[in-house]
């Protein structure tokens, strides 16, 4: 049978699920570059895991026999080795200021696990008799399990960033143990007999259930991030009440910004969305910096927040005064008096730094 179609399915279907999960990151706090970097970590984890699993099999086979050793590796050794190797880069990257919260961790972990699964799918296709059945079965079961298990580690790593003392390490260990437990249970299921009938349905259920769990965790994280934005988006960082209210209604943004496209053109609509996304990212970085306990991490987050603030001011100038006034009229703050509203608009039409000269630049440019 031609291997091209099964191989394509083995790679593209997991990639499609990764894209689905990635699209849940409303504020795009995790860059696509970092997603690709974590995928490279997942790709590199496969040959490392293969060497370690093979070594464990050869050692165990001397005392247990080949069949028992193979089962032990699949159900005990491999889940430990693969979960540690898949998410090692994610755990390392979590110490960098680019990593904001566990929403990033879930997406980065899912990316690493998905890349690992892609290579593993291709490896198993080289040994399969029915290539199409092997490919389809794996992309809806094993591949999704790999991504979801690694996402659990990413969530734990993201929460551990803001823990203190032993709680940080406890969170990380619990995340890895949870991933290993999911992986072990799945491998025990699929190695208990032929992959058909009820067992196949259960395996697919575990895979799809893992994706649903990952999406639920991301939505939980987005809910917490929305709370962060309510606390951090204020005049102290150059964000008006109206702009803050609009950012917090991000799910409705396409509808809310549609009149801008109609009145000012599609280019201004894109610029407005970019401006509001930068505000959201600034709010998240500001809150993360406030929560960070390590001085180096705190300094890195504050530096990123300062850079985002400059980009936000540039984006505000690109949007222009008249369009900004329209944006602020979309979601008026509750309870503002006329004078409060006027004061807010006079203050917030200016960049966060250099207000007088920023206003002149806006008017001239």
Residue ranges and their predicted role:
Residues 1-365:
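Hydrophobic alpha-helical segments at protein termini of multi-pass membrane proteins
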């Amino acid at each position: 049978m031609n291997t091209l179609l099964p191989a394509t399915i083995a790679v593209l279907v997991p990639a499609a699920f990764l894209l689905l999960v990635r699209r849940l990151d409303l504020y795009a706090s995790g860059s696509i570059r970092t997603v690709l970097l974590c995928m490279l970590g997942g790709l590199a984890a496969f040959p490392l895991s293969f060497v370690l699993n093979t070594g464990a099999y050869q050692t165990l086979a001397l005392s247990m026999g080949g069949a028992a050793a193979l089962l032990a590796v699949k159900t005990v050794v491999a889940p430990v080795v693969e979960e540690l190797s898949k998410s090692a880069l994610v755990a390392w990257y979590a110490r960098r200021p680019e990593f904001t919260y566990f929403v990033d961790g879930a997406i980065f972990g899912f990316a690493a696990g998905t890349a690992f699964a892609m290579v593993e799918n291709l490896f198993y296709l080289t040994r399969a008799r029915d290539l199409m059945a092997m490919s389809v079965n794996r992309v809806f079961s094993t591949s999704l399990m790999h991504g979801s298990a690694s996402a659990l580690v990413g969530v734990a790593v993201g929460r551990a960033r803001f823990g203190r003392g032993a709680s940080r390490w406890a969170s990380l260990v619990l995340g890895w143990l949870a991933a290993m437990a999911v992986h072990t249970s799945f491998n025990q299921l699929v190695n208990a007999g032929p992959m058909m009938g009820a067992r196949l349905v259960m395996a697919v259920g575990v895979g799809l259930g893992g994706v649903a769990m990952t999406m639920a965790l991301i939505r939980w994280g987005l809910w917490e991030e929305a709370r962060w934005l309510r606390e951090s988006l204020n005049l102290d960082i150059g964000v008006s009440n109206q702009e803050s209210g609009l950012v917090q209604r991000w799910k409705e943004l396409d509808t809310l910004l549609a009149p801008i496209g109609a009145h000012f053109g599609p280019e201004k609509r894109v610029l407005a969305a970019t401006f509001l996304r930068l505000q959201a990212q600034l709010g998240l970085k500001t809150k993360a910096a406030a929560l960070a306990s390590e001085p180096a991490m705190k300094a890195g987050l504050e530096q990123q927040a300062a850079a985002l603030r400059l980009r936000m001011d540039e984006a505000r100038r690109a949007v222009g005064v008249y369009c900004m006034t329209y944006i602020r009229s979309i979601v008026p703050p509750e309870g503002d008096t006329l004078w409060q509203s006027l004061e807010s608009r006079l203050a917030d039409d200016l960049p966060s730094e250099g207000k007088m000269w920023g206003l002149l630049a806006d008017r001239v440019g």
